[in-house]
Amino acid sequence: MASEFGILLTNQIYDQTYEKEMCDVIITAENAVRRVEVAGVHGYEWGATNHRLGLCEVENTKSIGRMIYEQIRCEGAYPIFPHYITDTLKYGKSIDRNDNQIRVDRDDERVRKIKIQPYFGEMYFSPENYITVFCKRQAISGQIEVSRSIIGRRMKYEESAEQTKGTINANKYRLLEKWRDLAYEQIEIERDNERCLTHNTDPIYQLIKKMRYGMMYPVHYMLNDRYKVVQERADMGVEKWLLQKIGRGTQRRKADDGDNDALLQLERMMSSEELERSVIESVIRFGSLYNAHAGKKTGDIPLEVLIKYCDSLTTFVHKKNREGGDNQTARDEIRRAVVKNIPSMKQENQMKVTPNIRNFLFFAYLNGFKRNNGVDIDPNNGTWSKHKAEVKKFLNEEQKKNENKPLKVLIDGAYISTDAEYGTVAHWVDWVVDIVMMTQVSRMIKEYNFIRLKKDQLISGMNKLEDGVKCYAYCLILALYDFHGRDVDGFAQGTRTAAIVETVARMFPDFRSEVSEKFGIDLAVSEESDELFVKKTMVSSFSDSGEMGYKFIFGWRKTDFKVETDYGEIVSDEVHRLYQAILDGKEWSKEVDDPEKYFVDDLYNRCPESIYVRNGVDPNNKIMIKKRGLVGESQRIFLRDLSHIGMNFKKLLLRLSSKRLHARGEHIQYHEIDVEDFKPCAIAELGLHCSTYIYQDLLVGANRGEYVKDAKELVWFDIANTNFNITRPFDRCWPSSCAEAELSLRFHLITKIFTRYRGERTSFVDIINELSEHGYVKHNFPSYKHYYLSVIQTVFEDQRAIDPLDFCAMISRNETRESTLKGFSMFTAIVKSERLIDTLFLNFLLWIVFEMENVDVSAANKRHPLLISHEKGLRLIGVDLFNGALSISTGGWIPYLERICSEEKAQRRLNADELKIKSWFLTYYMNLSLERRAEPRMSFKFEGLTTWIGSNCGGVRDYVVQALPMRKPKPGLLMIIYGDDGDARWVEWAMKNFTAVDGSLGFIYIDRHKLVNKSDFRVREMKIYNRGRLDRLILISSGHYTFGNKFLMSKLLAKTE
């Protein structure tokens, strides 16, 4: 007997309605989000879509970048339409794809069903049929002319006074004019369609996860804001700069730094009120807003104990006020008093005074000083002589530490050059003043039972500080040191200790080293950076007064180098050691080393921000710097192992004039560097320079509901392509266009590189020059799987019809990887071949394995083998798959493939040891297990990404998909799709991967206006009167099929385990 599946469409559930429990699905219009159309974009009132019980979505105003890359915290999330059902039908097994998520729903006791909230209302599902319910989004195709209008709009904006501020960037405008011409040429050859050609979310989704949806530009290595360049050296080369340390963090105000005002107010409070309870509480309150120095340590200092510490420590801060109101230490006053009591003498002369009648008053002063202070300061006696000897020894040691270059050090509260002859009148006066300071402060201090601090240390340290605010700030740190010990960092956020450390660090970034030096205590300084230069990007905070630094620019240029050569003298002995270790059967992970160890080349620096280091100080205590390595300013040097890749070093000077306004009209300022250095990701990853370039994504605008007409990131992407005389297509919206351009460019470059083993041995520079002259074929890959398979088939010259889903599933599994690849006759031939050139062709396995969809590589296991041809034969090197990037990058290994082998050795047969290495290499990659990348965190964001794409084109439609299992006469699956004024043709296209498999029973589309039946079942639409109200009822009759019970899906999946 046939059974029936009932779907009820009603406006509202009004009361206890038990007869409605008989329906399997109820669709109401309650809380439906109103559809709107703005400038041709179909969407919803987006503010009403936040946090509904459907696809987990945060506020519609959150940026798409934050939505994609952040861990969204909410009740749960629906997954993208899952593969595990079709895996069961198609393969008879369950493949772990990690695409399960916690569901967002609620049990409704009124109708005893489970409730969700798609945009078109509220839906209720019977529990037995609910486990296979999923959300789906359609990005609607918009008018293509709207997307193309960006060209004229952009050119007009770049010329506007609002953007240029009276200064036109000539290089940028020239490139934009070239881009405009290329864009119009591209439009001429495209098909004359009115609407966006395609919306394929998967390629964008995969490129985002691989961090390739955008472009790359050189990192800025800017001078650390703790230093500034001495003005007279600013125009010189970097190596000739003299640096001066900036003592206080707030003296150098940063652009867009809103915390400075609060910090300056806090300093004024310290200056006027010292460390009263209210000031201490303000310090803690300010620091608690941040957590840069917070950790997990507990055991906070009690507030009352901290106040008692400060009450004592502030008595060590001995200062007086001048009439003008400025703070000044008592040192100057005491110094003037001492000078009045000595005979008239030149300050630079050695301190010698003969006892006679003329100097009677001076010696009387010395005797009185000895009675009052207990110290003999007579310059003719042993105390002064002993002090001179100790200081001279100290000065000599400090100069030796500074590479025997003179510098100034602090002696008795004054700075003295280490090459000066110590013992002058001025030196004696400073010595006496220091003794007086120590004695007077000692009489004023309040005693406290310190645990670690010593009274003499505190007196001496405070006397060395001339800044009253710094004295008070350091009192707080000294209190923490005495209470906690040497390590005052790492306390949990919210603790007083963490807040105080945060506040003092923002006032005085070098407080750790200075407190240690001045007070002679062992305060931990491990967190304090010693870098002279720090990495910055175009969106970093820059000083309004300008910043200075440098950058590396890499590119390709034709040289005399030929790719048909072997690696020779530039290869280190480590390569031969690794070769022998693998022959001896040793484990790869224990033998492989840093890739730099395999080449004798000191041009490449794995820490480019540290290419300049300290070189001591000059006589005025200005820091001198020196260069490490051979790279010099304005030099272009070609890497010895990659002879077509040139490295150029340039000094940077960024001023306010480099600021630009955001094209989206938000009046957000940003710094823009030399746009001619921009590169598409596909091209940038052909060079080791990836480690000195940074990735800029195209995730701009809100995560849904905002139509981005243009953005600075999109301008940068287009300029990066224009730098190589290429452009993206304009027959689709910009999100899809940029993804298509990146994948098509990658397809072109990778296939050109690997087909060299079977054809002409071209260099990378030839490939890039050919690209710039003739462009590349623009493909339309429906998914990343299609792109992946197309590359492999092109390289292996295979023309079979292969299902991409099947192929990628087989490649991802160790058990079936080798057998799948041996389906390609060319692969089988190179595996059997004993020729050198065919063996080197096996390096394509790195691309096959690491460019799979969703692949993740552990940073602890990031080095893998690559084959090279050496003068002594076939060899191995370890390559780094990350290459300094946040994600897997081909830049860590592709550049080493440019050099192939010498022409006369290409057809050489391998010897026994080399054949053993080849076999080991093949086995390594056939059995290499890899994890899936980021799927548990990102899989549910697939539909959210589709919503963003639609928001930037023709709009969005919301759907709910239900998979209904059948058990007789054989297991099958019926797809039911619910929507609101949806597109049945799009639904048929979206379901094609599921309706095409064996076991599929077709689909039925239902919305409030129509019903489309493309299944093997009879569907009837009827009216039902329910307590005086007219509703709509849809009945699906099973015919000779039998609907599965509530356990059927579990039973189907259980068979595959």
From Swiss-Prot:
Example of a GO cellular component annotation carried by this entry: viral inner capsid
Location in the cell: Virion
Keywords: Capsid protein, Inner capsid protein, Virion
Entries under InterPro entries matching the protein: Capsid_VP2_Orbivir
Major site of localization recorded for this protein: virion
Molecular function via GO: structural molecule activity
Signal recorded as keyword: no
Function: The VP2 protein is one of the two proteins (with VP5) which constitute the virus particle outer capsid. It is the major target of the host immunogenic response.
Family: Belongs to the orbivirus VP2 family.
Protein name: Outer capsid protein VP2
Lineage of producing organism: Viruses, Riboviria, Orthornavirae, Duplornaviricota, Resentoviricetes
Gene name per UniProt: Segment-2
